[in-house]
Amino acid sequence: MIKVSNALQRILIGAALALFGGGAQAAAADSAAAAEKAPPKIEARNDRFAAPHPDQYASWKATAEQSEISDALAEDPRLVILWAGYAFAKDYNKPRGHAYALTDVRETLRTGAPMKPEDGPQPMACWSCKSPDVARVIAEQGEAAYFHGMWARGGPEIVNALGCADCHNTASDDFAAGKPALQLSRPYAARALEAIGKPFDKANRIDQQSMVCGQCHVEYYFSGKDKTVKFPWDQGTSVDEIEAYYDGIAFTDWVNPLSKAPMLKAQHPDYETWRAGIHGQNNISCVDCHMPKVQNAEGKLYTSHKIGNPFDSFEQTCRTCHTQDKATLQQTVAKRKQDVNEIKLKVEDQLVRAHFEAKAAWAAGASEAEMQPILTDIRHAQWRWDFSIASHGVHMHAPDVALRMLGTALDKAANARTQLVRVLANHGVNDAVPLPDISTKALAQQALGMNMQQFTQEKQTFLNTVVPEWEAQARSAGRLDH
């Protein structure tokens, strides 16, 4: 047996302790580093922030006062024809308060009546601008996993109304201290801003205020097999640049069954039109006009989260820059809205006729070669019209841009109809193509053979049975408090 001196024993024992102890310390350090890199858990339940941020929470909750449902199809039945074959022909209401974002996407006929998680018609992407649960699911499961599957799959997960964690890093020390802690909660929005050379983390506070709004108030499309959200900004954010992008990738939202034109549907390009308008050009942010600083009962200033019409808080919004009185500015805006609306209706009349005349041309025996340039004009005209009207505040944000877009839309629609006259004549049709009665929403939908009673009944069954199940599952899992 080899004898070891006491001194050598102490050296060996110390070395062993250092070796194994150091390993434990390294493991602990690695674990801490991993925890630091892990994204913070996102709290999607908005009422959890009522106590630390009472004024902001109360004003956010007050968006429920903006409850009016305004049926855009009933107001303008031409839209039914322009969106024939697309879900918007079933149902399209004007926007209302943020408190209703989740309710409205559940209740609209556009999302159908899926009775099972795998049922259609819409993809998961249709939740993307409706709830902070979207950011939570992306953080927990990854972006690809979030987008996979149909809209109904997300029902038990996406259960809290659009709120705090959509725009703020609610887990940060800054937010706890009462600072804005603005962040982009949608990774696809961050990528889009990078594409136009405006990375969020390098932007100033004013730019970031508009960027967080621009996560949702933008044009987007569903890309690839899993229908992931992408902003079409690779070539820029103007109507012409986005049109060129879509044409370059041969993207089509749907084919209008009347004309067989491959159509594009603009969503709500508020960020793009604001950016092009006088307010955006002068760095007046969305927050400056729609979320002003106001005083609470104790005289303390806070940012109102009752996002709405700037005229409702005139002294805190418009008055900070403009010298005119409220009535004068309201008249100016009303006149701009009237000007935009007049040309909008002219474009719609031309496009409605173009779709029906194209249908007649096909029926008369027109060839694809004859129709291709006509369908391109219809596609481009309606895209420019839609880009104008889908941005609901364009008459305020960028009226000159809206008028230019509508002017080019009118030209292209008229050009399509001029070509259609020749094609129809070549195939023996010399009389005017008759139009069905589309003077009301119901008549327009009837002209397309839409069974609205069936759609409505199926939706009501869905709301009465499936939605309560979603909410019960969410409460059971702790994702919904009430």
Swiss-Prot record:
Heme c 4 binds at residues 286, 289-290, 397. GO terms for cellular component: outer membrane-bounded periplasmic space. CDD domains: NrfA-like (cd00548). Its cofactor is Ca(2+); heme c. Heme binds at residues 126, 129-130. Keywords: Calcium, Electron transport, Heme, Iron, Metal-binding, Oxidoreductase, Periplasm, Signal, Transport. It is found in: Periplasm. Ca(2+) binds at residues 219-220, 265, 267. Gene3D superfamilies: Butyryl-CoA Dehydrogenase, subunit A, domain 3, Flavocytochrome C3, Chain A. GO terms for molecular function: calcium ion binding; heme binding; iron ion binding; nitrite reductase (cytochrome, ammonia-forming) activity. NCBIfam families: cyto_c552_HCOOH, PRK11125.1. Catalyzes the reduction of nitrite to ammonia, consuming six electrons in the process. This is Cytochrome c-552.
